Structures are given as structure tokens and as C-alpha cells.
Amino acid sequence: MDMNKKEIINTVLNETKKAVRGKDDVLRSILTAILAGGHILIDDIPGVGKTTIAVAFSHALGLDYKRVQFTPDVLPSDITGFSMYDKSSDSFRYMPGAAVTNFLLADEINRASPKTQSALLEVMQEGKLSVDGKSYDVPKPFIVMATQNPIGSSGTQDLPESQTDRFMIRISIGYPSKEDEINILKGITPASDIQPVLTGESLCSLQEDVKQVHMIDDLYAYIVSLAHLSRHHKDISLGISPRAAMALAAMSRAAAFIDGRNYVTPDDIQKVIPFTWGHRISLTGDARMTGKTTEQILNDILHSIPVPTLTEA
């Protein structure tokens, strides 16, 4: 990658940091997923900055932005749009829904009905939406950042594995450090004041550049070996799918790209695997009863497969 592109990426991160203090790793992970062409699920309690992060990124990336506050009465048509009869032309006219945008914040997605969740996740997967038998393309780029409150919060219901698998990554933000929280109280740049660094067109160009990042065959085999081990691990009831393996490859390329390299290393894979695969495996009842976590199991899998040595890059 030429230095100009690396400087652009650093500028995007620096702009978002103006509104989000002390969460550099979170911001980097989100940008990695965006460059990989994926969607983001943020799983955390209210008030830690989920909406601020979404607004900051939409402004820094120069994208059209919409937000939907999910509640049980939000309908699929609120997401996809609907056809309305136009008396003047004696025809039906398409009225766009919230998904007709570049950057959609789906706030508290696990408060919505399963039917509405499915409508959004279908658009995420297909990049198209269907209304009354007609298909419409969503704008490019199309990025969904969904948030959900921890399961057990009032009015929430867990997203099924088939739906969480549509998200490239799942991350948590966590509380700020004491020092960062003091700085937040003193005042930070409003997310809406973030200056655009890119446009939708230039972001699409960077996403295409990421796809050209080189990965040697041994690293493809490494990812497949990790996936296969997850499917036969004694503590895992639902292992990694081929789609999840593809997501890990895409995230690894984007991680290398952000670091200014045009080739993937094993470290790239190991760095992104926790938040790329953490929501895609289900532990057995016995594993949960003994207090094991997905992070521990993924570490066990990583330590069980020999790490390839780069001989060509």
C-alpha cells in the first residue's frame, strides 16, 4: 500500500478518536471490518458510546447516515420501504425505508421482532431489498452497525446464530478508564463535528484494494485447519462455518492493509480471530457449566494448530 492510503486510514482513525476517548482498539477493529466489507455488531450496556461511534464513523467516512431505534412495533417495511399508490400518476411509487442509506445504525436490534430482524439481515446479506415483488439495490457502500443490550435486559431477545453470523465482527466497548472518563466529562468533540476524510466512492475503492492483499496458500490452509478443529472440539456444539472462515480471511487482509502491508501474516489472523469468530461458536452445556469462555476455547484452538512460516510475501 502506498503511504498516502495509510495516511488516509490514520486520519480516519484520528478523526473518530476526537469523539471517542480511550477506545483505540475498538475503533481500529470497526474500521478493519468496514474495509473488509462487513457489518458490525456491538454488544454492550447503554451509555458507553455505541451511538457516538456510529455517528463518528459515518462522518469521517463521508457517508449518508440513518438510525433506527428498534422496538417491538418497528415493522419490516420501516427497514425495506413500501409501495404507495400515487393518484396523480395512477401507479404505485416506492417509498424508501431506513436501509436505503450508506451507514445504518440499527440501535438495540434485539428489541425488535424476529420478522423485522430478518428483514434487516436479509438486506445485509444480499445487498438488495425486495418490496412487492420488485428488487432494489441498496447504495454502495452499505454498512450496518447494530447494537444490542446484554441478554437479560428488559425487552430483549437473543439473536439466533444464523443471524449473528451475518455480522463480520462482534465487539464490546466497555467502560472507559478513570483518566479517559475525566476527559469525557471535561468535554470532547461532538461526533457530528467530525470532518469527512473519505467519500462513499473512495471507501469502495479502498475495499477493493483490500481484496488484492496477498495471502499465501499455507495461510488459507491455516484458517481451514482452525475451522475444522472448531467443528470437532469437545467444548463446542456449533463450530465455524465456511462463511465464517471467509470472514476471517477478509478481516486478516484488512488488518494487513491498515498496517500498510500488501500481504497477510499469521499474526493478522490471530489478532482478528477473537471478534471475528467469538460470536460464531456455541459452547456445550458442560463447557458453560464449568465456566469456560469462547475466548478460552479460541485460544486453545490457536495453540493446537502449528503456525505457518512465511516463505513468500
Regions found by a protein language model. Name each.
Residues 3, 232-313:
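C-terminal engagement/docking regions of AAA+ P-loop ATPases
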Residues 4-48:
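Pre-Walker A (pre-P-loop) alpha-helix and adjacent loop at the N terminus of AAA/AAA+ ATPase modules
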Residues 29-32, 85-105:
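Conserved alpha-helical scaffold flanking the Walker A/P-loop in AAA+ ATPase domains
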Residues 34-71:
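Walker A/P-loop
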Residues 44, 107-108, 119:
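Walker B catalytic acidic pair
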Residues 45, 79, 147:
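P-loop (Walker A) phosphate-binding loop of NTP-binding proteins
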Residues 60-88:
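AAA+/P-loop NTPase substrate/partner-engagement loops
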Residues 86-89, 112-116, 124-200, 204-213, ...:
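Canonical AAA+ ATPase core
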